[in-house]
Amino acid sequence: SLLERIGGEGSSADEAEEMENISVKRVQPDETEEWESFLQQSPLTLYLEMSSENYHRADLLGVALSDGEQHLFLDWETAAGWEAFAQWLQDPEREKWCYDIKGNQVALRRQGLSSDGYSFDVMLASYLINASDSAHQLSDIAQRRQIGGLPEDEAVYGKGAKRRQLTGQELAEHLARKVHTIHQLKPILEKELQENHLDALFFELELPITHVLARMELAGVQVDRERLQQLGEELREH
């Protein structure tokens, strides 16, 4: 079971049980109009699931959206055909919390969709706060904050040649757990950024740079990651 894959005790185990029984609405193509009012909320949490970690080549499998209470899932075909979703994505006034802005922007642009309005990225925040850690998967970030209930992708999909693709309800629930976790992490990470005096660096430098890097990658500009990391270290020291 999911609980066995996660383990944990106390409140973490309670959260794991809540996550195992997570409620998610699978929006069908003929139901999208009913959910347009949901997109009027701001902020919303967004998660895009891809077929691999290489967002330059990966297929988009599905989308999860959450307001913290309700979790929606759409397979990619349904999401791609939903005009109101495309408008919401590109609206800078509609706040979006996510995991990996750059990956989202590149993957969506490859599908002909622009996206804007990202106000928080839990992966980027984790890189700043836990710079010495190499593990920044969403499940790693949650585990470090004692947020239970999200299994590692490898535990869900399998590894290498044994990797399988999820579909239907199984995929919907996995993405609902991810989007719910992002929603939980956002205020925690924002507080950690403030406590570590990294909030100005995050909001005034790192977030804007992420948008620039996405555009550069889409344009095919080679990015010297090591040099950028070095610059980041120098900026943190000042």
List PLM regions with ranges:
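Active-site-proximal helix-loop-helix substrate-binding element of RNase H-like nuclease domains
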Residues: E20-V24, A64-E195, F202-L213
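Long, highly charged low-complexity segments
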Residues: S1-W88
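Extended, well-ordered alpha-helical scaffold/bundle regions in very large, multi-domain proteins
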Residues: L201-H238
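A general structural motif at alpha-helix termini
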Residues: L3-I6, I129, G232
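Compositionally biased, low-complexity linear motifs
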Residues: G8-E15, D133-I141, E233-H238
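Generic beta-strand/beta-sheet core signal
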Residues: L46-E49, S66-G68, Y99-D100, A219, ...
